[in-house]
Amino acid sequence: MIDRSILNNIPKKPGVYIFKNNKGDPIYIGKAKNLKNRVSSYFNKKNYIGNEKTYEMLEKATNLDYIITSNENQAFILEANLIYIHKPKYNIMLKDTRVYPYILVTDEQFPKIKYIRTKKEEKGKFYGPYSDVKFVKDVIEVLQSVYKIRSCDRDLGRKSKPCFLYHLGRCYGPCYKDVDETVYQESVEKVKKVLSGDIEEVKNYLQKAMMDYAKIKNYEKAAQMRDTLFKLENLFEEVAVEYKNGKNLDIIMYEPPVYLVLIVRKGYLISKLSFTMEGTLEDFLYQYYIVRKNEPPSLISTLYNEEISPEILDFLKEKGLKRIEKIGKSSKIYEMAYTNLQEEIKRQKDLSFALKQAKEILSLKKEPKIIEGIDISHLQGLYTVASLVRFENGKPKKEGYRKYRLDDIKAPDDFESIRTVIKRRYQKHELPDLLFIDGGKGQVNSAVEALKEIGYSLKDVDVVGIAKEDERIVFPGDIPDLHLPLDHPVLRLLIYVRDETHRFAIGFNRSLRSKRFEKTKLDDIYGIGPKRKKELIKHFGGIQKLLEASIEEISKVVKSEKIAKRIKESLGEK
C-alpha cells in the first residue's frame, strides 16, 4: 500500500489522480475538485468498509500520480480520456457482450471508408457501433458502388496501378490518376448522410439511374442499379422501425448488470447493442458516450427517470443531446426493447451458470473467466499452423486471437507443435484461468510438459481438452476422463471454445495454402516472370479476382493481350 506521506506533496487543486501497481500500470483513475482532500479519503479505512474492490485496489497500489487541471470540467474530460486509453482494472468499466464494429470515414484530402473492429485514435468520423459485421460490410459495398470512395491504404503521393475496385467502377482511383477533389468531397458528404441514417437520396438516385439506363437500352447497367437498390432496401428494411418522426435517438433499457442500447437513426433501427456493467444509468452514460466517445443522438429514451449529474448532462448537450426522456411502456419500441433485454439477461445468466458449473465439475482452482484455446492444423505435415482464441466471461474476445506459423515442424507432430506454441505464448504473456487444448490426453500432456519447461506447473493454471471421437473431457496425467451429457452447459461451453479454435486454425491454414498455391499457378505460366507476377498479385490480390477479370483488364497490367489470354486459359477459362 502507498505510504501516507505522499499526501504532503498533493495540492488542493482540481485534477486527476492515478493509482499505479508495482509495474507502473494505472489500476484506478479518478477526478477531484480538490486532489488533496479526495486522495486523503482513501487513507481513512472507514470510507471503504465493506467495499472489497477499493480495499483490494489500495492493497495493490504502490504509487500515486496526479495531473493538475485548470478546473473541474477539464478534470472530467481528462479522466474520461485516461480511462479510455488505460482501461484500469478497478474502474467501473463497460464490457461488450460481443465485438461491435464501426465504420470510419477518414479525414484526408481524399477520405477513405473502412470497417474497423474497435474505435481507435484515428482522424475522421466514426459511425456506429453496429451489431452486425455483415451489415457493415454490405453497407460499405453499396456505398462504394454508388459513390466510388476508396478503401485502400495506398500512398496517394505516389501514383500506382489502379486497384481492382477501380476496374469494377467502385472507386474513383485517386491512387492511379488525378481526381477532381470537389467531386470526390461531394461523394464523401453523401456517404456521411447515408451513414447518419438518411437513405432517401441514395434510393432516389438509384431508382432514377435504373430508369435512365433502361431508356437508352443499357440493360446491364440498369440491372446493376436495380440490384444495388434492392440490396440497400433489404439492408435497411430488415431493421426498419418507424419511430419519433424520423428523429435520431438511442433507447437504453437496463436491469444491471445488463444494459441494452437500440440505435435509431432517421426512423430506422440500425443497431442493437448489449453490455454488462456494475453501475447506475449515470455510470453507463459516462462510459458509453464520454469514455468511449460514442456520439450522442438528439434524444435518449430510458426506462426510468434517474437523476443524472449536471456535468454529464452538460457534456452530452454540448455534443448534440437535447433531452433524456422516459419511454412509454405502451409503445411498440418499448415492447421490442424489453423483449431483447430479457433475452440478453437470460443469455448472460446461462453463461454465468456455465462458468460457475465449470469450476465445480472440472475441479478448477477458480471460475474460468479467461479461457484460451489452442488448436493445430496442417495438411499431411505441411503448412503447419496454430491458432489461439481467447474467451472472456464465456464470450469470444477476438482482439485476443493469435495465429502462429510453425514452419520448422516438417512432419505431422501435434505434440511438438503444441509444445512450441505454448512456449512462444506463455514466455511473454500471462496465463489464462483455463487453458483448453483441442485434442486428447497426449496433446494435453504435451501442453503441461511445455508449461513446466518455462517454469509453470498445474498449480498455476488448469488444463483440459476434448477427445474428438466421443466429446470426452480429458485432464492431464492420471486424472480420469469426464463424460457429460451433450446438452450440459459446461460441455457446450468447451465445445464452443473447441469449435472456435478449430475454425480459426483451419481458416489460417487454408489462407496460407491458398497464397502459396496461387503463386505456384502463376509461376507455371510462360511469360510471367517475377516482375509481372508481383504486379498481378498487387493489382488483383488473388487468383479468384484474376479469374473474374476480363482479358482487357489483365492486358492493362501485363501490357500484352497475348499473355493475358494465356493467363485466362491457364487458369481454366478456355
Swiss-Prot record:
UniProt keyword list: Cytoplasm, DNA damage, DNA excision, DNA repair, Excision nuclease, SOS response
Gene3D superfamilies, per the entry: 5' to 3' exonuclease, C-terminal subdomain (1.10.150.20), GIY-YIG endonuclease (3.40.1440.10), UVR domain (4.10.860.10), UvrC, RNAse H endonuclease domain (3.30.420.340)
GO biological process: nucleotide-excision repair; SOS response
Compartments where located: Cytoplasm
GO CC terms of this entry: cytoplasm; excinuclease repair complex
Positions of the GIY-YIG domain: 12-92
UVR domain location: 200-235
Listed GO MF terms: DNA binding; excinuclease ABC activity
Family statement drawn from the similarity comment of this UniProt entry: Belongs to the UvrC family.
Oligomer status and interactors: Interacts with UvrB in an incision complex.
HAMAP family the record matches: UvrC (MF_00203)
Function: The UvrABC repair system catalyzes the recognition and processing of DNA lesions. UvrC both incises the 5' and 3' sides of the lesion. The N-terminal half is responsible for the 3' incision and the C-terminal half is responsible for the 5' incision.
Name of this protein: UvrABC system protein C
The species this protein was found in: Petrotoga mobilis (strain DSM 10674 / SJ95)
